[in-house]
Amino acid sequence: MNNRVHQGHLARKRFGQNFLNDRFVIDSIVSAINPQKGQAMVEIGPGLAALTEPVGERLDKLTVIELDRDLAARLQTHPFLGPKLTIYQQDAMTMNFGELSAQLGQPLRVFGNLPYNISTPLMFHLFSYTDAIADMHFMLQKEVVNRLVAGPNSKAYGRLSVMAQYYCQVIPVLEVPPSAFTPPPKVDSAVVRLVPHATMPYPVKDIRVLSRITTEAFNQRRKTIRNSLDNLFSVETLTEMGIDPAMRAENISVAQYCQMANYLSENAPLKES
C-alpha cells in the first residue's frame, strides 16, 4: 500500500504534504487554539481538514488558504464545512494578511500544519503583518520550534530566534511524533504558539537594519562580531554600547541586537528602497 495516499489523496512532495491523523494530537492542538465564534480564524494549508473540521465545528465562519487545487476543491464540497468556508486557493506567501484582517474587521488568529519546506520563509512573511494578527498556532518541524524559542549561548539560537522574539512571545505547546502523520515525516514535529507583542519590548527604528545585522552576524556565526560586523561597527562603537567585540553572534541577546540596530539607524541609516 502506498503510504503517501490518505483519504484518497496522494500527498505531493513538492507541497511538503504530511497529513495529521492522530485524534489525540488533533484534539490537543484544537484545545490549545481554543477557537471561539466571532473570531477571525484563518487556517494555512488545511489539507484533508484534520484541523479544519474540529475547528470549524466551533465556528460560523472560517477562512482557509490552500495552494493545492484538488484539496481546495474537496473543501468547497465538504458536507458540513463547505458553507462556512472562505477559500483562497493560493500560496500563503502571496497573501496580504493586513488586507484580510481589514476585510474581517479584526486581528487574525492564524493556525495550521505548515509544510516544512516553506515554514521559515512563511514565518518571516507573517512577522511583517503582526500588527494585524492576534496570535498564531503552528505545527512545525521540532528543530524549527527549538530555534524559535532558543535563547543566547545555544546552538539553536539564530536569526530566526532573534526575529521571532522581536515580534512575538514564543510558547512551545506540545511535541508530535512522526507516527501522527500520513506519510510519516522523517523528523519529529512540535506545535508552537506565537503571540505578537502588544508593546514591543525592544522597539527598533528600522526593521531592515535589524534584519541586515542579524543576517550578517549569523551568516558568519563562528566569527567574533568584531570581524563579522566590521563593515558596520568599530570595536570602539561596540564597546561604547557595552557589547563585547569578542562575542559571537549566538552570544548576543535580542535586546542587544535591537540596540545595535538603533545605533546604526541613527548614525548610518539605510537609504529608502
Curated annotation (Swiss-Prot):
Subcellular location per the Swiss-Prot or TrEMBL entry: Cytoplasm
Which parts of the chain are coiled coil?
Answer: none
Principal location: cytoplasm
GO terms under cellular component: cytosol
MF terms from GO for this chain are: 16S rRNA (adenine(1518)-N(6)/adenine(1519)-N(6))-dimethyltransferase activity; RNA binding
Kindly report, in one word, the top-level EC class recorded for this enzyme: transferase
The protein's role, per its UniProt record: Specifically dimethylates two adjacent adenosines (A1518 and A1519) in the loop of a conserved hairpin near the 3'-end of 16S rRNA in the 30S particle. May play a critical role in biogenesis of 30S subunits.
Q: What is this protein called?
A: Ribosomal RNA small subunit methyltransferase A
| Native species | Salmonella newport (strain SL254)
Q: What is the lineage of its organism?
A: Bacteria, Pseudomonadati, Pseudomonadota, Gammaproteobacteria, Enterobacterales
Q: Which gene encodes it?
A: rsmA
